[in-house]
Amino acid sequence: MINRQLSRLLLCSILGSTTLISGCALVRKDSAPHQQLKPEQIKLADDIHLASSGWPQAQWWKQLNDPQLDSLIQRTLSGSHPLAEAKLREEKAQSQADLLDAGSQLQVAALGMLNRQRVSANGFLSPYAMDAPALGMDGPYYTEATVGLFAGLDLDLWGVHRSAVAAAIGAHNAALAETAAVELSLTTGVAQLYYSMQASYQMLDLLEQTRDVIDYAVKAHQSKVAHGLEAQVPFHGARAQILAVDKQIAAVKGQITETRESLRALIGAGASDMPEIKPVALPRVQTGIPATLSYELLARRPDLQAMRWYVQASLDQVDSARALFYPSFDIKAFFGLDSIHLDTLFKKTSRQFNFIPGLKLPLFDGGRLNANLEGTRAASNMMIERYNQSVLNAVRDVAVNGTRLQTLNDEREMQAERVEATRFTQRAAEAAYQRGLTSRLQATEARLPVLAEEMSLLMLDSRRVIQSIQLMKSLGGGYQAAPIVEKK
């Protein structure tokens, strides 16, 4: 007897295993995931030599010691519409992860149903259409009532839901990194516009000084013409110069207005609440890049972190698509009361219990599962290729911005020498005027080359500040990858 039971158990096990194996759909085609760039590939070219420095710090703008800039950035971070949109994307990604996770949990619902029906005398339940109280039938009208609890659980043995939840969590982590990328773009954008405006203020001051010098020359030449001491050519030449300077002044004032309006839109200020921006000196520029990039660059660039999480999410989606080829199991159950007579609904004899284990075997699907897997794998490989190119672009940004900044530093050193040379010439002209060896007009006009070279120096300083902010942005702006968000 025992041997017969063991034989039956063994036979059932063999049949069950055979059913499970045969119930798996055939994966006709699935390629391996594309390779991601290795950390040792993330470095600058050997012929690029830049000054070494550390990574940018969080809230990097505070190191510039500019209260106006601090106030503008804080206002931007507290009221920016793009940042608010990014945070809403975080919430959406989180809710999607919660939704998928909830679908894999035990589902319990209370059920109440009242069904007033007339039983057909020619149907499957035709005996109940008779009016025979002795037999417990008082048809053809019945009022069936059902109350109870319904429960269902999907046994995720192969990880279909688990992988989908992991992909949603990856998308949420990507959204967190994207929010940091938006913050970085906003802060650097505000700083660049702010210092562009400061450079315009200083340029306007130099142009007004230039105009004062030329205006003195115009009046001096006009006086000489009036006294018949010289021809009108120098006078009209000076007039042409002052008109050219007036044109430059008008252009710079227009540029200040344009920059202010761009800044207004970026910080989210209205027509009447734009803060006044007072002129300040341009900050000192910190140059240099970290000694090595490698994996550290991936962790410090929020855009790369977002791409990395999207890659991971795509790989989880592939796992979920593969798991669909295996049999799926679920369990449904009902416990409650059911009666075709309302007066007997809550009696003990109306109790009902249903236990329904389910098995789904994907035998023939017309190629749907394979098409889904192939498309999901292709999307994942596309994301990997996009990530690899983003990493290469990030290294390029560091190299290009670092090289540009170093070139500007070299140009500034040479321009500073030119400024000093023209100042020497100006001092010599003033000394000659003090000794009575030259006229006041010549001594005054000797300042024009100095102002011109100072304008060139200012333009280089402005470009250096903007470029240093761009380099800092390409290094991540002090961002560090946040701890991984996992589902509890």
Curated annotation (Swiss-Prot):
Location(s) in or outside the cell: Cell outer membrane
UniProt keyword Signal, yes or no: yes
SUPFAM superfamilies reported in the protein's UniProt record: Outer membrane efflux proteins (OEP)
Principal subcellular localisation of the protein: membrane
Gene Ontology cellular component terms for the protein in this record: cell outer membrane
Residues annotated as signal peptide: 1-23
Residues annotated as transmembrane: none
PROSITE patterns: PROKAR_LIPOPROTEIN
Biological-process GO terms, alphabetical: response to antibiotic
Entry-linked InterPro entries: OMF, OMP_efflux, RND_efflux_OM_lipoprot_NodT
Keyword Membrane: yes
A Pfam family annotated for this UniProt entry: OEP
Lipid-linked residues (N-palmitoyl cysteine): 24
GO terms assigned for molecular function: efflux transmembrane transporter activity
Key words, A-Z: Antibiotic resistance, Cell outer membrane, Lipoprotein, Membrane, Palmitate, Signal, Transmembrane, Transmembrane beta strand
Residue positions of covalent lipid attachment, annotated as S-diacylglycerol cysteine: 24
Membrane topology listed for this record: Lipid-anchor
Family stated for the protein in its record: Belongs to the outer membrane factor (OMF) (TC 1.B.17) family.
Subunit structure: Could be part of a tripartite efflux system composed of MdtN, MdtO and MdtP.
Role description: Could be involved in resistance to puromycin, acriflavine and tetraphenylarsonium chloride.
NCBIfam families: outer_NodT, PRK09915.1
Name of the protein in its database record: Multidrug resistance outer membrane protein MdtP
Native source species: Escherichia coli O6:H1 (strain CFT073 / ATCC 700928 / UPEC)
Gene: mdtP
